Amino acid sequence: MPRSKNAVASRARKKRILNKAKGYWGSRGTILTVAKHAVDKAEQYAYRDRRVKKRTFRALWIMRINAAARLNGTSYSRLMEAMHKKNIDINRKALAEIAVKDPSAFSQIVKTAMD
């Protein structure tokens, strides 16, 4: 009985890794073993950074809200406390967008919350 080498599956596996490594510098994009390590590491970074992205954007929204709140004579923490007490439910993403795109509307929100 002839030896079975499973060439189709192994070639597909190698091709999948090298396609993911396309565009990598030097041997990282051409040599299978090096490319495999590079792709594995890239996928680890991608997995981690999909989670870090959420934290980063929340921090950015808070910075923008704080800057706009200080232009209106209050701080981020005092503004959020006042909004919670008045049951003004606007999430940070939307509030940051309003602060950047429509400062007069943001001023009205601050005035409503602080009164």
From Swiss-Prot:
A Pfam family annotated for this chain is Ribosomal_L20
Q: Which UniProt keywords apply?
A: Ribonucleoprotein, Ribosomal protein, RNA-binding, rRNA-binding
**Gene Ontology MF terms in the entry:** rRNA binding; structural constituent of ribosome
InterPro entries on file: Ribosomal_bL20 (IPR005813), RIBOSOMAL_L20_CS (IPR049946), Ribosomal_protein_bL20_C (IPR035566)
One of the GO biological process terms: translation
Query: Cross-referenced PROSITE patterns, in alphabetical order?
Result: RIBOSOMAL_L20 (PS00937)
Q: Which cellular components does GO assign to this protein?
A: ribonucleoprotein complex; ribosome
Q: Sorted alphabetically, which CDD domains does this protein's record hold?
A: Ribosomal_L20 (cd07026)
Domain of life where this protein originates = Bacteria
What this protein is reported to do is described as: Binds directly to 23S ribosomal RNA and is necessary for the in vitro assembly process of the 50S ribosomal subunit. It is not involved in the protein synthesizing functions of that subunit.
Instruction: State the HAMAP family in the record.
Output: Ribosomal_bL20 (MF_00382)
- Family label: Belongs to the bacterial ribosomal protein bL20 family.
- Please report the name of this protein according to its UniProt entry: Large ribosomal subunit protein bL20
Name the species this protein comes from: Prosthecochloris aestuarii (strain DSM 271 / SK 413)
